[in-house]
Amino acid sequence: MGNWLTGNWSSDRSSGYSSGWSPGGSSGVPSGPVHKLEKSIQANLTPNENCLKQIAVSSVPSQKLEGYIQENLKPNRESLKQIDQAVDAIWDLLRSQIPVKEVAKGGSYGRETALRGCSDGTLVLFMDCFQQFQDQIKYQDAYLDVIELWLKIHEKKSVKHEHALVVQVSVPGQRILLQLLPVFNPLRSNENPSSCVYVDLKKSMDQVRASPGEFSDCFTTLQQRFFKKYPQRLKDLILLVKHWYEQCQEKWKTPPPQPLLYALELLTVYAWEQGCQAEDFDMAQGVRTVLRLIQRPTELCVYWTVNYNFEDETVRNILLHQLRSQRPVILDPTDPTNNVGKDDGFWELLTEEAMAWLYSPSLNTESPAPYWDVLPMPLFVTPSHLLNKFIKDFLQPNKLFLKQIKEAVDIICSFLKNVCFLNSDTKVLKTVKGGSTAKGTALKRGSDADIVVFLSSLESYDSLKTNRSQFVQEIQKQLEEFVQAQEWEVTFEISKWKAPRVLSFTLKSKTLNESVEFDVLPAYDALGQLRSDFTLRPEAYKDLIELCASQDIKEGEFSICFTELQRNFIQTRPTKLKSLLRLIKHWYKQYERKMKPKASLPPKYALELLTVYAWEQGSGTDDFDIAEGFRTVLDLVIKYRQLCIFWTVNYNFEEEYMRKFLLTQIQKKRPVILDPADPTGDVGGGDRWCWHLLAEEAKEWLSSPCFQVEQKGLVQPWKVPVMQTPGSCGGQIYPTVGGVTK
C-alpha cells in the first residue's frame, strides 16, 4: 500500500507501505495547482528525473518520441496499482463515517493521463444526502469540515482548498495530489444522461447564480467514461502534450489556469478523432496536428455531442450560446456550461511555444512533415454569413497545392504513356484526369488524383470486365521497377478484391511538398475522341445497355469509360457552385468519419449530382446564397424517398432502346439519381445504401447556425421539385410514375 502524505514533498521512504497510509509529513499542501509544486518536487527528484526536467521535449527527434514517452512519461504500472489501493483505502474510511453513496475518480489520475512523478487527481464523493445541485452549494463546506475531522482522528492530514480537501497519495515513483470533493450525483443510472439532467443543471445554476462549469465535478463519472474508450496510444500522445505544456509553464512568470491542461487533453482527443481514429499511428504526426491547432486559438471551437446534443431546446440554447462565444471554445464533453478553453491571456504564450516546436529541426526530420487534416472549428457552428469564408479558409486548396497536384499527375501520366507499355503490344490511347481535382472541386489536403488510362487491348466492355485486373497488376509491376531509378517514394494500397479494378498508391517526391494519393484505372475507350460539337455515338450506350440486359452486370460498372463526360458535367459549372460542392463534400466526409458503427452510405458522387440539381432547379445564377444552397441540398437528402433525378445532356428519350431503358430506370425504387454520363449508373440506388442515416444527420443540421440569420430567422431552401419526368425534361413523354400520370 502507498503512503498518504499530506503537504509533504519529501522523498519516498522504503517502509510503511504495507497497509493504509502512513501518517507523517508536514501539514499544509500548497494551495495552487500541481504546477506550483514543481520547485518543491524538483529538489527531491532522483538524478534521472532531474535530467528529464532539463531535457526540452521539443529537442527530441521525432523518431524517438515514442521511446521518450515509454522511458520517461508513463507511470509505472505497479506504482499506479499501489496508488489505486491507497485511494480505495481513503474511500473505505470515508464511507464508514459519512453518507457517501459512491465515488468517481477524476483529474489526470481518473482520466488515465497522469504523468510519471507528480500529477493531479480527484476523488469525487457522491453524497447520498445531496438531492439536488443546490444542496451541494448549501452543505458542501460543512461536509468538508466533517471529512477533515475524521481524517485528523485517523491521523491523516489534509488541507482545505476552495471547495475541496487536498491530500497527497505517495508511493515510490509516483505522487498524486488528490482532491476530495463531496458533490451531488445527477446521474441516477449507468446510462447516458437524458436532456432533463442538463435542463435541471441550467435551472439550478440560474437559481444560485453559479459560474459556468461550477457543477462540472458532478459529471466526473461521464468524464471517466469518455476517456476510458480511447486507445492507450492516444493517451500516450496526451502525456507528451502535457509534458510539453509543463515545460512551457516553467518559462512563464504567472501560472496558467488549471482548466487549460484539461483543454489540451481534449484538443488532443479532438485531433485524433477528426484526423486519424487509428489505434496505431505516427506519434510525430499527432504532435504536429495538435501544435497546428494550438496555433489557431481565435478559430478553435471544439465540442462533442456524446452526452448532450441539440434536440432539447434548453440544451440547444446552452450549446449555441457557448458555440457563438469568443474563441477559443473547448467544451467539456460532460458539461455544456463548461468552456475549459476560455482564454485567460495564456493562449498567445502557448501559440508561440507551439510554433517553436512545430518548426524545430527535431520535428521536421522528413519533408514534407505529415500531419492529420483537422479543422480548428466544425462547419456546424459557422454562421450563415461566414460560410463563404469557411470554404475559402478551410476547404479551397491554394494555388501551390493545385500546382503540386498537377505536377504529380503529369509525372504519372508521363510514366503511363511513355514507359509503362513501352515493350508491349498494348498502347495507351489516352489518359484522362478524373476525380475532384479534374472537376475543380478538390478539397484542401483531402482529395485524390484519379487517372483513367484507355488501353488499345481493351476493345469492349466485356474485355474490360475480363482483363482489367491483369492490367492493374502490370501497371503496378512496371511502376515498382520504374520508381527504383527515380527519387520517388511510392506506397501501394493492398486491394481487398481478388481481381482489383483500380491501382491505389501514394506518391512522394522531393519536388512535392505534399504526398499525393492516386487511383489509376484501366478503361475501354467507348467514346473515342470527344469534341464539344460532336454528337455521341449511340453505339456506345446501345452496346452497354444490351450487355446489361444479357448479363448480370452491376449498375454503373462501366461508368469509368465515361469519365470525360462526368468531368465535363461538373467542370463547366460556375465557381460558386463548385464552392457549394466543396461544402457538401466536407459535410458528407465529416459525417462519414464520425458514423459508428460504420454503414454503407450513398456515394459522394450522388451528393454532387444532387447539389448540381438543386442549383439548376432552384437558382441557376452565378451568384447565389451559399446557405440557401446548402439548406436546399439537405432538404433533398431528407426527402430521399421521393427523389427521381436525371439529365438528358448526353442521352435522351429519342432512340427507342434508350427510351425503354430510361423509363425502366426512373420507375425503380426511390431514390433514383441517374449518372448524366452513364444511364446504367443509378447512384441513388433505392435501398442499396443507407440514405436514412444521411437523412437523420441532415435533420439534426437544421438547427445549425449555418441556417440562422439574425432578424430574418431561418434560411429557407429553394423551391426544387423532388421528382422529374420525361415530360419535365422536354421528352414529350408522360408516363405513369407511382400511379400518377405526370
Curated annotation (Swiss-Prot):
Location relative to the cell: Cytoplasm; Cytoplasm, Perinuclear region
GO biological process, one term: defense response to bacterium
Binding site for ATP: 436, 582, 585
Keyword Ion transport: no
Xref: InterPro entries: 2-5-oligoAdlate_synth_1_dom2/C (IPR018952), 2-5OAS_C_CS (IPR006117), 2-5OAS_N_CS (IPR043518), NT_2-5OAS_ClassI-CCAase (IPR006116), NT_sf (IPR043519), Polymerase_NTP_transf_dom (IPR002934)
Chain positions covered by the region annotation OAS domain 1: 60-374
Cofactor(s) needed for function: Mg(2+)
Lipidation (N-myristoyl glycine): 2
EC number in record: 2.7.7.84
CDD domains: NT_2-5OAS_ClassI-CCAase
Reactions it catalyzes: 3 ATP = 5'-triphosphoadenylyl-(2'->5')-adenylyl-(2'->5')-adenosine + 2 diphosphate
Broad class of where this protein is predominantly found: cytoplasm
Pfam family, one: SMODS
Tissue localization of expression: Expressed in the uterus. Expressed in mammary glands: expressed at low level before the establishment of lactation, then expression strongly increases, and subsequently decreases during early involution.
Segments of this protein annotated with the region Disordered: 1-35
Domain of life: Eukaryota
OAS domain 2: region residues: 382-721
Modified residues (N6-acetyllysine): 417
Protein's name in the database: 2'-5'-oligoadenylate synthase 2
Organism of origin: Mus musculus
Gene that encodes it: Oas2
